């Protein structure tokens, strides 16, 4: 370990937060020697093993106090870091309609770039208003029917509030209202003041979107709205490398004393249901392990099972609506297509401006008549799945003005995935500190580690590989399975059990079930992003608030550990917080 790591940790306390994060441009200044930490790093100290300094294992940890650094697995392979840096560019910069290499934005989109939602590659920030172009706004709108928790069908699952002219965005974001409410009393009966007299406060969001905000036909009815924030993208490939069998064993162990999500777990058979394994109608993930796909483990709702078809792999498509060879359809809905095809302003604008084969409106122009344009607008915008691939390719790929040119090439997507799989977890800090060591002991003693499982060992990392990467591998004569960073047999320390739990909070997450979020690296958030907001909707402004939300209700799966935390003296509570901010 070099001195640079420790110099940067100290410098990180003093420098202004960064809002972008290119790999090596954020190196901290030399502010002096930190001999004690230098001597302790990488060695067993107190109740920490030597391995715990490396949360991502030896192949997945960076010495830098950064969320954007490449892993040693990337750096160890000749040429891969160059692909990593190119992939990083697709994350850090904004997409446009026609300007290469980041072209293809729209016709409707959630954001015009990734960095808006992941400031410095970390967790999104709490917002008081919804604006898609605000850097740090990691919120996705969750609009669903409360009777069955199903997403509404009139807008996309990740609702879009932006569109290119002349189309009207599916939702007018100017009509979205976010109001932050104060908790006046805990449903569980716990006081808003700790026994030693220190007070804490809790807030939660109420979100309203009037029906008039929807530019769809029909407009939705009987719906509720929640917010879900992005989390950090670093280290996700390490979670991808954990064997399904090891995750199943964890669920089985917890099933002995807890109720698990029946959508995932068969309590009678004491095993996962078929629905717990990921598959998609547009690829072969469902056959990755013979008769089934990889086990779901990504997103709060545990909807994704492979990083190569996970939240990030999909986001580069559905957040921007930038298509690629294995995504020849739009992120859209029939209700939006119908509304746009019936809008006189839309039709008139295309009639005036869409006749040239070089115009991005040309695919919608048809024969230039109002009737023809309306019919074509509906036909092109109503391509929401692989079933509409032929229509998409006819008008939005092979026809003018695209003329067969992909918006994102197979090579570019491969480079994006090298970056995505190659993001390192920052090394742990201050493990030689006596308070941090006491905090670790207390964290386990009061039961936090029951859900925030400290450590896992990855398997062989026999990952599923997507069609775009395979196509690029074929072009250059390589084996696709050897082209992405791998993390086999690594001892990692993410502090998650990869199980869904319920906390029964006010205005809770959509279904009530939420995957335990990894804690690794979160202690750097304020330094790197300027905020320390936590939980699925950023309702927790501090670690203490995040913990106390776990005890809002006595029904919470984490009520007992929270009650114990509540009754600890302040010095012990502070030690737990210091531990969480160090791992």
What kind of region is each of these model predictions?
Residues 19-21:
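C-terminal motif of bacterial Sec signal peptides marking the signal peptidase cleavage site
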Residues 1-9:
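Bacterial N-terminal signal peptides that target proteins for export
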Residues 26-85, 94-417, 421-434, 442-583:
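Electron-transfer interface patches adjacent to heme c in soluble/periplasmic c-type cytochromes
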Residues 88:
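N-terminal cofactor/phosphate-binding cores enriched in small/glycine residues
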Residues 1, 24-26:
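Intrinsically disordered, low-complexity terminal tails
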């Amino acid at each position: 370990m070099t001195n640079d790591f420790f110099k940067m940790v100290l410098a990180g306390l003093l420098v202004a937060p960064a809002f972008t994060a290119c790999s090596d441009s954020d190196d901290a200044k030399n502010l002096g020697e930190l001999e004690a930490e230098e001597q302790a790093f990488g060695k067993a100290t107190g109740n920490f093993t030597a391995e715990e300094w490396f949360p991502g294992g030896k192949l997945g940890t960076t010495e830098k106090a950064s969320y954007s650094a490449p892993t040693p697995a990337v750096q160890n392979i000749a040429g891969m870091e160059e692909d990593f840096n190119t992939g990083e560019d697709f994350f850090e910069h904004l997409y446009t309609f026609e300007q290469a290499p980041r072209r293809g934005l729209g016709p409707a989109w959630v954001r015009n770039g990734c960095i808006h939602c992941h400031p410095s590659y970390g967790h999104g920030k709490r917002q008081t208003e919804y604006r898609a172009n605000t850097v740090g706004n990691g919120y996705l709108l969750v609009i669903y029917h409360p009777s069955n928790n199903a997403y509404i069908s009139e807008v996309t699952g990740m609702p879009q509030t932006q569109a290119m002219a002349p189309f009207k965005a599916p939702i007018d974001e100017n009509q979205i209202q976010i109001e932050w409410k104060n908790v006046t009393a805990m449903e569980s009966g716990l006081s808003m003041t700790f026994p030693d007299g220190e007070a804490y406060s809790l807030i939660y969001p109420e979100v309203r979107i009037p029906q008039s905000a929807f530019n769809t036909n029909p407009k939705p009815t009987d719906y509720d709205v929640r917010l879900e924030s992005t989390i950090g993208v670093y280290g996700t490939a390490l979670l991808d490398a954990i064997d399904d069998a090891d995750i199943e064993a964890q669920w089985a162990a917890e099933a002995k004393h807890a109720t698990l999500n029946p959508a995932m777990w068969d309590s009678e058979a004491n095993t996962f249901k078929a629905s717990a394994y990921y598959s998609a109608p547009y690829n072969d993930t469902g056959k990755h392990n013979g008769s089934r796909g990889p086990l779901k483990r990504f997103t709060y709702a545990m909807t994704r099972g492979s990083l190569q078809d996970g939240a990030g792999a999909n986001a580069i498509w559905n957040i921007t609506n930038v298509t690629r060879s294995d995504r020849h359809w739009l992120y859209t809905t029939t209700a939006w297509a119908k509304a746009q095809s019936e809008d006189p302003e839309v039709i008139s604008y295309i009639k005036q401006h869409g006749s040239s084969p070089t115009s991005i409106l040309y695919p919608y122009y048809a024969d230039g008549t109002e009737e023809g344009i309306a019919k074509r607008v509906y036909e092109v915008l109503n391509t929401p799945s692989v079933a509409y691939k032929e229509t998409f390719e006819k008008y939005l790929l092979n026809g003018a003005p695209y003329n067969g040119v992909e918006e994102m090439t197979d090579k570019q997507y491969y480079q994006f995935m090298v970056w995505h799989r190659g993001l390192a977890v920052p090394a742990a800090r201050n493990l030689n500190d006596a308070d941090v060591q006491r905090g670790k002991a207390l964290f386990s003693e009061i039961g936090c580690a029951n859900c925030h499982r400290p450590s896992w060992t990855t398997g062989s990392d026999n990952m599923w590989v997507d069609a775009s990467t395979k196509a690029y591998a074929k072009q250059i004569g390589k084996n696709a399975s050897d082209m992405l960073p791998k993390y086999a047999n690594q001892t990692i320390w993410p502090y998650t059990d990869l199980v869904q739990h319920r906390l029964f909070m006010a205005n809770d997450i959509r279904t009530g079930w939420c995957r335990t979020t990894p804690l690794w690296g979160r202690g750097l958030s304020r330094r790197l992003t300027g905020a320390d907001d936590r939980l699925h909707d950023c309702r927790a402004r501090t670690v203490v608030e995040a913990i106390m939300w776990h005890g809002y209700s006595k029904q919470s799966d984490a009520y007992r550990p929270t009650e114990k935390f509540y009754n600890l003296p302040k010095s012990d509570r502070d030690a737990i917080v210091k531990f969480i901010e160090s791992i």
